[in-house]
Amino acid sequence: MNYSTLIAVASLLTAGTESKKDGYPVEGSCAFPCGYDNAYCDKLCKERKADSGYCYWVNILCYCYGLPDNAAIKGYGRCKPGKK
């Protein structure tokens, strides 16, 4: 099989696919505290176009599965309210 044909077919199969990521959603560089409320986090995550979410009990913060690739998630560092 010709390698260029193989590459063309692989490119067509992956065209239009969205990559998704998991993480703590943020607003103003601060994650959302949840108080152990899974329903709140699931709703919050779905509003941000994620597949689902839950309250991660260790950090008591909402964690989302399947966020769009362009969604902001918590990185390293401190929360800076008001900063986008």
Curated annotation (Swiss-Prot):
Q: Which CDD domains match?
A: neurotoxins_LC_scorpion
Disulfide cross-links: C30-C79, C34-C55, C41-C62, C45-C64
Q: Where is the signal peptide?
A: 1-19
- List keywords of the entry alphabetically: Amidation, Disulfide bond, Ion channel impairing toxin, Neurotoxin, Secreted, Signal, Toxin, Voltage-gated sodium channel impairing toxin
Q: Kindly state the tissue distribution recorded for this protein.
A: Expressed by the venom gland.
The entry lists its GO molecular-function terms as: sodium channel inhibitor activity; toxin activity
In what residue span(s) does the LCN-type CS-alpha/beta domain sit?
21-80
Which BP terms from GO are recorded?
Answer: defense response
Q: List every position bearing Proline amide.
A: P81
The record's section on Gene3D superfamilies has:
Knottin, scorpion toxin-like
Pfam families for the chain:
Toxin_3
Assigned GO CC terms? extracellular region
Which superkingdom, per the lineage? Answer: Eukaryota
Protein purpose: Alpha toxins bind voltage-independently at site-3 of sodium channels (Nav) and inhibit the inactivation of the activated channels, thereby blocking neuronal transmission.
What the entry says about domains is: Has the structural arrangement of an alpha-helix connected to antiparallel beta-sheets by disulfide bonds (CS-alpha/beta).
- Family membership: Belongs to the long (4 C-C) scorpion toxin superfamily. Sodium channel inhibitor family. Alpha subfamily.
Identification of the protein by name: Toxin To10
Native source species: Tityus obscurus
